[in-house]
A protein has these predicted regions:
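Extreme N-terminal starter segment of soluble prokaryotic enzymes
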Residues: 1-4
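Short, well-ordered beta-to-alpha junction loops that form the rim of enzyme active sites
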Residues: 8, 94-97, 137
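Short, active-site-adjacent cap segments at secondary-structure transitions
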Residues: 11, 45, 98-101
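Short N-terminal binding/cap micro-motifs at the start of the first secondary-structure element
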Residues: 11-18
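Short, surface-exposed acidic-centric catalytic microdomains
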Residues: 21-61
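Short amphipathic alpha-helices and their capping/turn segments at secondary-structure boundaries
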Residues: 22-36, 75-90
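Divalent-metal-activated hydrolytic enzyme cores
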Residues: 43, 53-55, 59-82, 86, ...
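Internal, conserved structured core segments that host functional sites
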Residues: 94-105, 109
């Protein structure tokens, strides 16, 4: 099986804070499969570390209130280009991320509150009919 996974889940230090979300359950789940890692935020050219970003009123803003919509959509498009080339059977994405969150995202006020919703990449992949799984469901 061909699986694409958020790079942070596999131990890549690509989160906004320069850390990772290494997930042993995901590592065990994908063992023995063809795995490709991706991080749409890094694919957009955003640095590590970088300002935290959340979706507010449908647009991506960073913790300084700057509009980051274009940059994040660029990363999503680059990720989709890779995904279309790879034709994966499954995509496992990082929970709560403004790009990758599948079921929940932060509320856009930088207070740590979660709301139902999807990150930019997750929403687009689901719209296109890909099989997408939240890392928390592995």
């Amino acid at each position: 099986m061909k699986i694409i996974v958020s790079a942070c889940l596999l131990g890549s230090d690509c989160k906004y804070n320069g850390k990772n979300n290494l997930n042993d359950r995901v590592i065990r789940f994908v063992a023995g499969h063809e795995v490709t890692a991706l991080c749409p935020e890094v694919m957009a050219g955003l640095g590590i570390p970088r300002k935290c970003a959340e979706i507010r009123d449908g647009k991506m803003v960073d913790s300084d209130g700057r509009d980051m919509n274009f940059v994040y959509h660029l990363g999503v498009q680059r990720a989709i280009d890779l995904i279309e080339r790879e034709s994966p059977d499954l995509i496992i994405l990082q929970s709560r991320s403004p790009t990758c969150g599948v079921r929940q995202i932060y509320d856009g006020r930088f207070t740590g509150n979660l709301i139902s919703g999807q990150g930019f990449l997750a929403r687009e992949l689901i719209r296109r009919g890909y099989s997408v799984m939240d890392a928390g469901d592995v």
